[in-house]
């Protein structure tokens, strides 16, 4: 179940192939190499810090697995997760393979 802290409709729809499962938004992204994956993670980290909402993620060479959920809302999906997913989409567009 998705809950919105503000009870407003979602304004940001994720563009990456996000899967909703177990009250999380999940995706796995691939990059050219480790350096590109780490650069992406660094950009996301700065944006997440600004938003005060941080992903659960792991990196293995050129892959980044991301899980988004709101821990302080009982580990459920909220507007915060959808907003961060939208920012991750925006950042990923710079790195996406064509």
PLM feature spans:
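Short, conserved charged micro-motifs
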Residues: 34-39, 76-77
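Short aromatic-glycine-(Arg/Gly/Cys) micro-motifs in beta-strand/loop hairpins
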Residues: 7, 11-24
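C-terminal structural segments of small proteins and small subunits
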Residues: 70-95
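A short N-terminal helical cap/helix-turn-helix that marks the beginning
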Residues: 50-60, 86-98
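Short amphipathic alpha-helix segments
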Residues: 39-47
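A generic structural motif
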Residues: 62-69
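Short, well-ordered beta-strand elements within core beta-sheets of diverse protein domains
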Residues: 24-32
């Amino acid at each position: 179940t998705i809950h919105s802290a503000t009870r407003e409709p979602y304004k940001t729809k994720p563009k990456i192939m996000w899967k909703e499962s177990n009250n999380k938004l999940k995706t796995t992204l691939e990059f050219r190499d480790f350096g590109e994956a780490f650069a992406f993670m660094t950009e996301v980290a700065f944006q997440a810090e600004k938003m005060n909402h941080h992903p659960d993620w792991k990196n293995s060479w050129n892959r980044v697995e991301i899980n988004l959920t709101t821990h302080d809302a009982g580990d459920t999906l909220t507007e915060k997760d959808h907003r961060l997913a939208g920012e991750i989409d925006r950042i990923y567009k710079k790195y996406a393979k064509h």
